[in-house]
């Protein structure tokens, strides 16, 4: 059998009252009223409290989002109109219908990846039917007519 544990004695009421009376006489600040803070500003700014980092039990999204605009979706198809053919012959420029969300840098990267050609610049416009047209100007070391034959435009 274990030895009896030592139990701390509770101070009796009279001793505790004497202790409190002594503290009051000496002027201990625990028993005095707290002085009110004087506010000089009209607006009240709520104090900043501790914000813990989020630690979720499970992820709310099951799969990471995939890129919906890849190179094959950016370039829809090349234009084969007479004006587009004239651009190919005269200005060393290919004309494509592209995705409406694609910007010039994405169009340039898609043309480079799909056809292995360097582009000098890309001009875009949105047609009245709501599609985006891109004029892809090639560098002088590439011939737009040869590229058009390779693609199958001509």
UniProtKB/Swiss-Prot annotation:
Key words, A-Z: Ribonucleoprotein, Ribosomal protein, RNA-binding, rRNA-binding
GO molecular function: rRNA binding; structural constituent of ribosome
Keyword Disulfide bond set for record: no
Biological processes annotated in GO: translation
Pfam families tied to this protein: Ribosomal_L23, Ribosomal_L23eN
Cellular component GO terms, alphabetical: ribonucleoprotein complex; ribosome
InterPro entries assigned to the protein according to its UniProt record, in alphabetical order: Nucleotide-bd_a/b_plait_sf, Ribosomal_uL23, Ribosomal_uL23-like, Ribosomal_uL23/eL15/eS24_sf, Ribosomal_uL23_CS, Ribosomal_uL23_N
Superkingdom in the source lineage: Eukaryota
Secreted is among the record's keywords: no
Family: Belongs to the universal ribosomal protein uL23 family.
NCBIfam families to which the protein is assigned, alphabetical: PRK14548.1, uL23_arch
Stated role: This protein binds to a specific region on the 26S rRNA.
Protein name: Large ribosomal subunit protein uL23
Source organism per UniProt: Fritillaria agrestis
Gene: RPL23A
